[in-house]
Design a protein with these regions (language model features):
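Conserved beta-propeller blade repeats
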Residues: 1-9, 41-49, 75-103, 110, ...
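Serine-hydrolase catalytic core recognition
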Residues: 48, 242-370
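Short loop/turn segments that connect beta-strands within beta-propeller blades
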Residues: 60-64, 124-128, 174-178, 219-223, ...
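Short glycine/acidic-enriched loop and turn motifs that connect beta-strands
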Residues: 16-19, 107-110, 159-163, 209-212, ...
Length: 370
């Protein structure tokens, strides 16, 4: 990532931070075994190997890097971006080129394995000093992003340590006053991602709503009454689909949209009306040759008298006078709802196309229902 003035490049790369097998057994340099005597020994499909991703910056001019890269985490054994899902959104240049903000979890071994407590650290390029700006916030901090004028820093935050499915709130820090404000504290849903508006007076974000994923606008306010009543939050889009990967443009909100029957395509949404214009048609020629399942959205009464949203996918050419085998898709959660997803692994459309009635309930405890 380039600094705002284009004079530096910010990047991460792996450095040796722990003992490797060849350190213990130098006589066997070609050995590819994994020796484990402590947690954390694996992140999903990636084993702990004595290497950690750390953050560097290097001077840059006219297409060339100049001098030597500086590791702003030099001497530590911590990582940034964090495993397993951390990416470039965990790093941010301050608007005036003098500071870098990054996410890390300053724990190792067993303590690292059972904790979700990441923090945002501020590195000063002039003094080479590092400060934890979220000290005392015990949950998962993620995705720091500056307002367009550089006066505020926003990020996603979970409250509780060790609870990876906690509610994601949006925190805004006024860099001049030092005041932190949780501006979604009283909103009864969890955020997925966000972007600042062009004028910095509002924030657009993605969030779930009754097993769909939509775009919202949040107007910045100090009025406690508005915060408690949710008056500062407005839902922009609707419909039975997932909207993700949103970017703010001069012409509207550009985002990816998919549903059970259609893979992701790009849409441009009007921020005021929520109307979406389809910008790509990558798969339309293929869809024209496919008999699609019919999707039904049903609210089923549960045994305790509540309502449960359930998706039913009927096979192509479904005949209600015939009997069909059924498949029950029972997703566990609690990280995500059973939304109208298009998966290359669990593709419910493909299952229905083979002659099954697919039943996909949003069981109790899944998000997007408050």
């Amino acid at each position: 990532e380039y600094s705002p003035d284009g004079k530096y490049v910010l990047f991460s790369t792996e450095v040796k931070t722990g003992e490797q097998l060849t350190d213990k057994y130098p006589a066997y340099p070609k050995a590819n075994a994994v020796l484990t005597d402590d947690l954390m020994y694996r992140h999903w499909n990636s084993y702990e190997d004595g290497l950690s991703s750390q953050v560097f910056y290097i001077p840059y001019s006219e297409g060339k890097v100049l001098g030597k890269a500086v590791n702003i985490m030099e001497g530590s054994e911590f990582e940034s971006p964090t495993m397993p899902f951390g990416d470039g959104e965990q790093l941010a240049w301050a608007p005036y080129n003098k500071s870098i903000y990054y996410i890390t979890k300053q724990k190792t071994g067993m303590a690292y394995a059972v904790s979700t407590n990441t923090d945002i650290f501020h590195y000063d390029l002039i003094t080479k000093s590092t400060t934890n700006i979220t000290e005392g916030m015990m949950g998962y901090e993620n995705s720091p992003a500056f307002s367009p004028d550089g006066s505020k820093l926003a990020w996603l935050s979970m409250k509780r340590d060790g609870y990876e499915a906690d509610k994601n709130d949006l925190i805004v820090l006024d860099l001049k006053s030092g005041k932190k404000q949780n501006i979604t504290e009283f909103w009864d849903e969890t955020l997925a991602a966000f972007k600042w508006s062009g004028n910095g007076k509002s924030i657009y974000f993605e969030a779930g709503k009754e097993a769909t994923y939509q775009l919202f606008e949040l107007t910045l306010t100090d009025q406690v009454a508005d915060l408690k009543q949710g008056k500062h939050i407005r839902q922009i889009t609707g419909g039975d689909h997932e909207i993700t990967g949103m970017q703010v443009t001069a012409h509207g909100l550009l985002a990816s949209r998919n549903d059970f029957n259609r893979a992701a395509e790009l849409y441009l949404y009007n921020q005021k009306t929520g109307e979406g214009q389809k910008m790509t048609a990558v798969n339309d020629e293929i869809y024209a040759k496919i008999r699609m399942p019919k999707i039904e959205k049903r609210w089923i009464q549960t045994s305790d008298g509540k309502k449960m949203l359930t998706w039913v996918l009927l096979p192509p050419d479904f005949d209600r006078n015939k009997k069909y085998p059924a498949l029950l898709y029972a997703q566990g959660g609690p990280q995500s709802a059973v939304s109208p997803f298009y998966s290359y692994r669990w593709n419910l459309q493909l299952m229905a196309s083979k002659g099954y009635v697919v039943i996909a309930p949003n069981r109790r405890g899944l998000p997007t229902f408050g």
